[in-house]
Design a protein with these regions (language model features):
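Glycine-rich phosphate/pyrophosphate-handling loop used in enzymes and phosphotransfer proteins
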Residues: 1-242
C-alpha cells in the first residue's frame, strides 16, 4: 500500500474494484444492446423464450372434450372434438400467457406454439385457424395467431386467418367465464376471400381455453363454410363455468 503526500494510505484495491465494476456495467449494457431480449424463465440473453425452458413449464394430461372440458373421448358428447392444451392456467404457464398478451412479446408466442406442438396427438389438419383478435383489442398482434405460427413451424401445417368477429365485443366483457359461455349466435364470420385452395380440415388455435364457448362458436362458423374441425389447441386450460 502506497502513501499520498499527507502520509495517508492509498488502497489501490478499491480503485481496481471500482474500475472492474464500471467495465462490467459497460459490458452488460453492450450485451443488452446486442441482445435486447431474454428468456423469461432462465434469463438467457438473446432468447425470446428457450424452447427447452417452455417445454419444462408444460404438463399435458391428454385431451379434453371441448363441450364439457372433461376427459376425451366423452360419453356425454360423442360428437365433440378433442381439445389439447399444454398446461393448466396457473403458475409459470399463466405468467407466460400474461407476458405474451400484456408484455407485447409476440416472438414469445411463437416459441410457446412450438413447445405446444409436442402435446398434440391427432391426425394433422390441412390448416391451423387461430381465434381472431377482438375488434376492440388494443394489442398490436394476435396472441393466438403467434401460437399458431409456432405450431405451424413444428407441424408443417399452414396458418389460415379466415375468421373475424361478427359482433363488437369489448375484451373486458369476456374476462369472466360466465360471459364467455354466453357468446351470441353467429359471433364469428368466415372470410371466404382468405380461404386457401385444397383446405378441408382444420384445427382451431387459442391462447387460453376457459369454457370452450369461443372455440365452439368458431367451429360452428367453420363447419357452415364446409370445413371439418378435427380438434383445437390452447397453451393453457382454465376451466370455467359452462
Amino acid at each position: 500500500m502506497g502513501k499520498d503526500r499527507q502520509g495517508r494510505g492509498i488502497k489501490k484495491g478499491r480503485c481496481v474494484a471500482s474500475d472492474f465494476s464500471v467495465m462490467a456495467g459497460i459490458a452488460s449494457l453492450f450485451w443488452h444492446v446486442l441482445f435486447p431480449v431474454a428468456c423469461p424463465i432462465c434469463g438467457r440473453a438473446g432468447s425470446t423464450g428457450c424452447l427447452g425452458c417452455i417445454k419444462g413449464v408444460l404438463s399435458p394430461s391428454g385431451p379434453v372434450c371441448i363441450e364439457c372440458l372433461n376427459c376425451y373421448p366423452c360419453d356425454r358428447h360423442t360428437l365433440a372434438f378433442p381439445h389439447y392444451f399444454g398446461a393448466t392456467h396457473k403458475g409459470p404457464a399463466r405468467q407466460l400467457i400474461h407476458l405474451l398478451k400484456y408484455g407485447h412479446h409476440g416472438a414469445l408466442g411463437i416459441s410457446m406454439g412450438r413447445a405446444l406442438a409436442a402435446c398434440l396427438s391427432f391426425p394433422l389438419p390441412d390448416a391451423l385457424v387461430p381465434i381472431p383478435l377482438h375488434n376492440e383489442s388494443p394489442r398490436f398482434f394476435n396472441q393466438s395467431e403467434k401460437i399458431a405460427q409456432g405450431l405451424s413451424l413444428e407441424l408443417g401445417v399452414p396458418v389460415m386467418n379466415c375468421l373475424s368477429w361478427n359482433v363488437r365485443i369489448h375484451p373486458r366483457a369476456l374476462t369472466k367465464s360466465y360471459a364467455r359461455s354466453k357468446l351470441p349466435e353467429g359471433a364469428f364470420k368466415l372470410d371466404e376471400c382468405r380461404l386457401k385452395a385444397g383446405i378441408r380440415t382444420v384445427m382451431i388455435c387459442d391462447d387460453v381455453c376457459t369454457t370452450g364457448a369461443t372455440i365452439l362458436g368458431a367451429a360452428k362458423t367453420l363447419a357452415k363454410g364446409g370445413l371439418q374441425v378435427l380438434g383445437s389447441a390452447s397453451f393453457t386450460l382454465a376451466k370455467g363455468k359452462k
